[in-house]
């Protein structure tokens, strides 16, 4: 098994060149990226960067408040943000029309993107969200019929809504109870404010485009009371409280008719039993539909909320027809890792609860170092404990420093500056053969500190709002100008330009990881245990290891400290025996290797 490198890209934001997007701005004001923006030069850049796969996030048609760009608005009371959550799927057999230049040809445009991706030598990963769908699944847009979509009965279309649970139902119901959404009172307040033409009100539920339309009418015709009422009446379905009777269970296992503000109230929970049902068959049909279109893999959302038996069945069935399709699981319970790989059949698992959490604790301790002792959970020794826990599962773990759920490394809430990430990057990328994932803009040091709307200033790049990101715009400019190769290869100091410094380091590291045999498929040897007493080595803040393949041996050292470190590292006799390394006058157990590592950084030394 060699080392996949996955680039997660969010097309809605990636291709958006709007210079000054408005907080909670509408699609009309803030714009959106398109399928076409992921053009051949972009894909050539990703291939040059060392990527093997592109995870296109936010492709499947989801609920949205917007009415432009070919969109049909869902009820705003349950939609999060102006654009809506990409994980509240409204139609599994469709793609978002706003991503297409011609919404009527949206599926053709996505198929063209798949073709461009394959032509660039890259593989396509798509989301599979098996646990939940939007509250209005199948009620807004029609299924697009095509090869593999036979039996496209809507989820829930034939459910018996008079019972709470039935093995034949796709959802859970609460007969005699109506849904009460957490923002119901605020929604009514917003409607009263809009009715009274209070345009100073902070609207966050009623769609921005509708508020803008009402404001424009009131400005142009301030005395036309009847006309204003008529305008509101046109949108009565969006301005009346959302009705759902019987209420349905909410996506995050909230089995209640009254979900809370922190629940996934924009979604409804799918009903899986421990054995085959019609729900299983419908979800298989969805996967097969996209596999037939050329999708090479699926990132499976919130796997632990769905019975493992379903995944074992569906993965086996899909792979019997499409053996090369890969399945990646978003999982968080480390004690289930072995089951999901060895029994269920996933190809890769998130190691968020393992290596990511370990590295984050180490980084945060050193970035915010106040001179206090290092607790065990903040120590670099945790890296050793994590790989020892994983054992033979290491190559199946998906390593990352960022994704859409986590805060950007450079945000105020994590590492504060992307240049503080290099030590962690070296471990996450170079430690073993495990796949690595990069989140779009990460290679530019994107900070995620915009206040976009539904997403506040939380250190994440929004997935709920129409938005444009400055660092990503500058990256796209580098790609369109073809300057990225020159910038990466240049030796001119760029310390005064943090973005270029980060880009140079990340691009070089990723390309090396993709091309070097020792990193792609080599053996790992952890040097920390034998260097606890070595001069300059701090087991809590330093991590050292070897990667070896055939005639090549590399030494890596990460320094998580905020201070430069010089250390004398020894390579034990056991390492020479284990890796089959030849000894020499300059390389032997008695000859310590002097290494100097800048603060929060990593170095690589070629030994053989």
Where do the protein language model's features map onto the residues?
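C-terminal beta-strand-rich structural cap/linker in extracellular carbohydrate-active enzymes
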Residues: 589-608
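Glycan-recognition surfaces
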Residues: 233, 320-411, 429-432, 460-484, ...
